[in-house]
Each structure stands twice: as structure tokens, then as C-alpha cells.
Amino acid sequence: LGDVYKRQEVICVSESNRITGQKTFGLKHSIVIENGINLTKFNPHREFSNLRNEFGFTDEDFVIGFVGRITLQKAPLDFVKSIALARQKDKRIKALLVGQGDMEEETKEAIRLYGMEKHIRTSPFRSDVPDVLHAIDVFCLPSLWEGLSIALLEAMAMKKALVVTPTDGTKEVITHQQSGLIVDFGKPEELAECYLAYLHHPEWKEDYGVTAMSTIQERFNSRRVSQQVTEVYYDILR
């Protein structure tokens, strides 16, 4: 048993995560095993409940989704402002914001200040995330920093069009104008332009969504990830 304790392997979910660990903690033995997604649960071709109807969206609405903690890291105020800006150019833009956090009240106040109460629907965290993702047209992750967002991977598995910021983990999985659109940090006006681009170029929404879904199927299948973790354990115990 003593030999087991002498061997260490730190599992990191992204290459940027591993590099940060090396710089911050001096990690000597580390390996990257990316997060896994349950592709049976997050399958865009299965049946879903009609959350668009529950939240009051019509078939004509183009719904932008935000799913995550409502904290400074996730830049919810940028998201709210981006929706207001996009609606100045196309009234079909609506939004669904799902999450909780220490900026909840500030975010709701921003929604009121922009006059978006009827156009940005909010909800606390929900257990039916696949249904939430099915209900939206575009998934937005405007984070200021990020490791590797599980919510992003789930949206990719659901074949969603993506608008993201270039955080370290995100850049490892999203290629600009191939599997999503990447905009700079703190630029709600650029987020807005991306929503409108997807609305006016539906082929981008479809093509980028397919590419994102393929990335998940190839790299982030939970069964594949479980096998990789098991192999690490076996190597340590040998």
C-alpha cells in the first residue's frame, strides 16, 4: 500500500487547466482527461417537453440561452445588455436565462432597466437541462474566465449554435466559424451581432451545430472518458 501512496497522477479536464496547475502548484505528474457527456441524455434526436411554450416563446422567436451560475465570472450583465442590443435590430430575439448566484438580483435589475422583462425569461437551476437546451436556438457563454464548462459541452452535444468568449478551456474545443462564434471578453455588442448573424444565416446555425455535436461524440463521450480514468487507476496500482 505504501507504494501506491508514492505514486501520484493529477487528472486535469483541459490542457490549460494542467498548465495552470503546473505553474501554480508545481505539478509534476498530470494528465488531461476531458469531461465526459452522457450522449443518451444529451441527444438532440430524442423527445423533449415543450419548454418554449412553458416560457411563453413562439415559433417565430429566436431564443438565446444562458445556463450557469449568475456570478461575475459568467458575465450575466453582458448577456442581458447583448439581448437588449440585438432586439434593437430584430424583435424576434428573445432570451432564456437559467441559473442562480450572487449576482441574481443585480441581473434582474439590469433586465428591468433595459425594459427586457417580457423578452428575457429567467428560471432557477433546473434538472431538465436537455429540455432547456432543446428549447433555445443559440447557447451563449460570455464568461470572463473558464476552465472547461460542462454547460458548454452539453450544449454542443445538443447541436446548438454557440456564441462564446475565448477562455482557455473554450478555445480548446471551439473553432471560430467552424463549431461556433468566438467574441472578445466584455463585448456585448459583438455578442448581439453574433445572435443576429445566426438568425439571418440559418445555415451557419445548422452547420456549426453539427460540427460541435461531432466534437462531443468523438472526444467527450462519457464511456470513453470513464475508460480513460479507469486506465489511469490501473497504471497507478501496477
Predicted regions: what they are:
Residues R7-V32, I37-K41:
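A short, active-site helix/loop in glycosyltransferases that binds the activated sugar's phosphate group
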Residues L1-Y5:
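Short, small-residue-biased leader/transition segments that mark boundaries at the very start
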Residues K108-P124:
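Nucleotide-activated donor-binding/catalytic signature segment of Leloir-type glycosyltransferases, i.e.
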Residues N53, E190, A197, W204-R219, ...:
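A short, well-ordered alpha-helix in the C-terminal region of glycosyltransferases
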Residues A161-V164, I174:
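Short hydrophobic beta-strand element within catalytic cores of glycosyltransferases
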Residues F62, F66-Q88, A95, D102-K108, ...:
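A conserved mid-protein helix/loop that constitutes part of the nucleotide-sugar donor-binding site
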